[in-house]
Amino acid sequence: MVLGKPQTDPTLEWFLSHCHIHKYPSKSTLIHQGEKAETLYYIVKGSVAVLIKDEEGKEMILSYLNQGDFIGELGLFEEGQERSAWVRAKTACEVAEISYKKFRQLIQVNPDILMRLSSQMARRLQVTSEKVGNLAFLDVTGRIAQTLLNLAKQPDAMTHPDGMQIKITRQEIGQIVGCSRETVGRILKMLEDQNLISAHGKTIVVYGTR
């Protein structure tokens, strides 16, 4: 849930006035898995990928977060927590950062900020539940199709005469659904043959999704 634009949301303006604003280039790392959690982040502009790595360094993308989303909120509720995932800039980002200690002080003054954060956490829990269900009940073709539909709803998806256009590599799709890049390529070709999508390099048009 996007909190709103700074010029039209007094609560957001007030919150951001207590934060430090930092800019991150695309593909830079905002949060390292395993580091001590002491800071809450809020995406002012841009989007990020939340991911985990196994012992061999293989990555799995858990989610994408966009403008108006909080990051790193779990450590807010229990001291001594370590970051459970990596967060990497998907695009160039402008991010507001505030210590947990200062955030706790702010919500004493304006509890609405905490309500907004809680609403986001509830929505993410619902998305996670749906993803677990997809892993359990959908085959890899279904998971890829569902992923494309979800990506077509992201803020950085672009309108296209035939649907919605997204930019994503086969490797990234594989990291989301848990399969190889080669498998993704075969399934995208199959979806193309069924006239459900068109795929050219990183550009995919998902038909009929506007």
UniProtKB/Swiss-Prot annotation:
Activating region 2 (AR2): annotated span? 20-22
* The keyword DNA-binding appears for this protein: yes
Q: Where is this region: Activating region 3 (AR3)?
A: 53-59
- N6-acetyllysine PTM positions read K101
- GO molecular function annotation: cAMP binding; DNA-binding transcription activator activity; DNA-binding transcription factor activity; transcription cis-regulatory region binding
Phenotype caused by lack of the gene: Decreases expression of genes encoding virulence proteins. Drastically decreases survival in host macrophages. Decreases virulence in mouse.
Q: Which PROSITE patterns match?
A: CNMP_BINDING_1, CNMP_BINDING_2, CNMP_BINDING_3, HTH_CRP_1, HTH_CRP_2
Site feature (Activating region 2 (AR2)) residues: E97, K102
GO terms under biological process: positive regulation of DNA-templated transcription
> Which of UniProt's keywords are assigned here?
Acetylation, Activator, cAMP, cAMP-binding, DNA-binding, Nucleotide-binding, Transcription, Transcription regulation
The answer to keyword DNA-binding applying to this record is yes
Q: Which NCBIfam families match?
A: PRK11753.1
The record's note on its domains? The N-terminal domain binds cAMP and is responsible for homodimerization, while the C-terminal domain binds DNA when cAMP is bound.
| Known function | A global transcription regulator. Complexes with cyclic AMP (cAMP) which allosterically activates DNA binding to regulate transcription. It can act as an activator, repressor, coactivator or corepressor. Induces a severe bend in DNA. Acts as a negative regulator of its own synthesis as well as for adenylate cyclase (cyaA), which generates cAMP. Plays a major role in carbon catabolite repression (CCR).
Stored PANTHER family: CRP FAMILY TRANSCRIPTIONAL REGULATORY PROTEIN, DNA-BINDING TRANSCRIPTIONAL DUAL REGULATOR CRP
Designated name of the protein: cAMP-activated global transcriptional regulator CRP
Gene that encodes it: crp
